[in-house]
Amino acid sequence: MCSSRCLLFLATLAFLIHLSLARATPVSTPAQCLAHSQNLLRTTNHMLEKAIQTLKHYPCTAEDIDHEDITEDKTSTLNACLPPELAKNESCWASGKTSSVTRGSCLPPQKTSSMMTLCLSSIYEDLKMYQTEFKAINAELLDHNRKQIILDENMLTAIDELMQALNLNGETRPQKPSLEEADPYKVKIKLCILLHAFSIRAITINRVMSYLNSA
């Protein structure tokens, strides 16, 4: 009798622990992913405006910088995330690509396709690359100890939150920052270049999430 009661107690305890963990683990929805992307766009634009104002004696405006896309030839976002009405030969193009991460829960079942899955995976890789670059630059800015400008933690948090929503399995690829110069001037110029490029990518990401959240 005691043995049966012990087994029943352990089974009940295990069930309650499992239920507690399930409730404690937040699961994103397309609507939440859209909210994350809107927050990303808002915080990125705020950081870009702050950089242009703070670094007014640097070539930091869109007209002055040398535009650079650090994701060029490394991710498929620009091709995979085309609006459906513009995408042609979707199955043929996407069949030769591989997805390194799961789509998380940003992609609703009714809009699942190989191209859209690749699009979300590419967005995740974009975010990972920019996150690595921004963290490296922020470390340099802090090391210079002039506190003229540092990255907004709200933007870095927004990047991390959207990455978590896109990658529920927690799979990551190691990234190495391209920043090599420790010269304060070059670091600030690099910051401006990255912020302009990332603000454009944030617009694309927000458009994709808006489409996935539409009826």
Curated annotation (Swiss-Prot):
Could you name the Gene Ontology cellular component terms for this entry? Answer: extracellular space
The GO biological-process annotations, alphabetized, read as: immune response
One GO MF term: interleukin-12 receptor binding
The disulfide bridges present are 33-106, 60-192, 81-119
Q: What keywords appear on the UniProt entry?
A: Cytokine, Disulfide bond, Glycoprotein, Growth factor, Secreted, Signal
Instruction: Offer one Pfam family short name for this entry.
Output: IL12
Main function: Heterodimerizes with IL12B to form the IL-12 cytokine or with EBI3/IL27B to form the IL-35 cytokine. IL-12 is primarily produced by professional antigen-presenting cells (APCs) such as B-cells and dendritic cells (DCs) as well as macrophages and granulocytes and regulates T-cell and natural killer-cell responses, induces the production of interferon-gamma (IFN-gamma), favors the differentiation of T-helper 1 (Th1) cells and is an important link between innate resistance and adaptive immunity.
The protein depicted here goes by the name Interleukin-12 subunit alpha
